[in-house]
Amino acid sequence: MARHHQPRKGSVAFSPRKRAARETPRVKSWPQVDEPGLLALAGYKAGMTHVMMVDNQKNSPTEGMEVSTPVTILEVPPLTVMAVRTYEKTSRGLKTLGEVLATETKDDLRRKLTPPADDYDQEAAIEKIRSNMEYVADVRVIVHTNPRLASVPKKKPEVFECGLGGKTPEEKFEYALEILGKDVRASEIFSEGAFVDAIAVTKGKGFQGPVKRWGIRIQYGKAARSSKGRHIGSLGPWTPSRTMWTVPQAGQMGYHRRTEYNKQILKIGDASEADLVNPDGGFVRYGLVRNDYVMIKGSVPGPTKRLVVLRKAIRAAGKQEEAPQINYISTASKQGV
């Protein structure tokens, strides 16, 4: 019997499905955290492997049993705090009130932007913000990555804005001044077992047809045999006499900025423990992990070498933040897999 109801194919929630404006993702919202500290970390996707761990999820069918779990390895060199930015609240949203720049910067940063001039007065910038602290609504920091330390073929750092934890803007500002110009490691931001949101630009698939892009059904019978099987049955009604934007058509697929919520950190390791996760022959299309790394349960968006921003989970209510016991990490070669 024919079905009376069939939902549309594909979601229009992400339309228009076009290429991301830039490869470094911009974090659009931040969780409210009382403890001072950075709310995000950036790393480069090295690849995937699997581990044998004891399932510690309450009420799980495999609770207390050893299970095989796929994991993603991200190489996370330290982030360098290069500036402090304050915002004031206006009728049109947050507006930049003032900035404090680090006087000493790394040489690689010149590949991305011009550092502060030699006569830049940092103390005057700090005093100007402190005198207007009653107008400050939020404080964030601008950080840059250090790709030279990772196994990615680039030297130019990525620059992005990172939120701060703290109860008041004054507390956030004082903490930001403490870390200004310093490196912050992954172990100072996250702990094992914590939940994070993975934000990245997905793999690019290029120009694809509507069957792969939207998941519509292939035409059957004579329509399929006439070499026109992989297209939609109709572009729309006679009236209105225009094609609606909701009609599934061919176009760009992939290379979109996406957020995946509640990814658990299973392990945080330093450079001395890199051999625990490096497979024989290195990760395919990446190489060997040579710096600090983070092991994430499951997958994250993007191909290898892609920058992934890990933000403290914004929807982590009720999540059990306890690291499971890992009994085995597979280091078998991934070549030809």
Curated annotation (Swiss-Prot):
Family matches, as Pfam families: Ribosomal_L3
Record bears the keyword GTP-binding: no
KW Nucleotide-binding (keyword) present: no
Span list, region Disordered: 1-29
Matching InterPro entries: L3_arc_euk (IPR045077), Ribosomal_L3_dom_3_arc_sf (IPR044892), Ribosomal_uL3 (IPR000597), Ribosomal_uL3_arc (IPR019928), Ribosomal_uL3_CS (IPR019926), Transl_B-barrel_sf (IPR009000)
GO BP term, pick one: translation
PROSITE patterns the record matches: RIBOSOMAL_L3
This protein's GO CC annotations: cytosolic large ribosomal subunit
GO molecular function: rRNA binding; structural constituent of ribosome
Record keywords: Ribonucleoprotein, Ribosomal protein, RNA-binding, rRNA-binding
Ranges that cross the membrane: none
Protein family (similarity comment): Belongs to the universal ribosomal protein uL3 family.
Function comment: One of the primary rRNA binding proteins, it binds directly near the 3'-end of the 23S rRNA, where it nucleates assembly of the 50S subunit.
Subunit structure: Part of the 50S ribosomal subunit. Forms a cluster with proteins L14 and L24e.
This protein's name: Large ribosomal subunit protein uL3
Organism of derivation: Methanothermobacter thermautotrophicus (strain ATCC 29096 / DSM 1053 / JCM 10044 / NBRC 100330 / Delta H)
Gene: rpl3
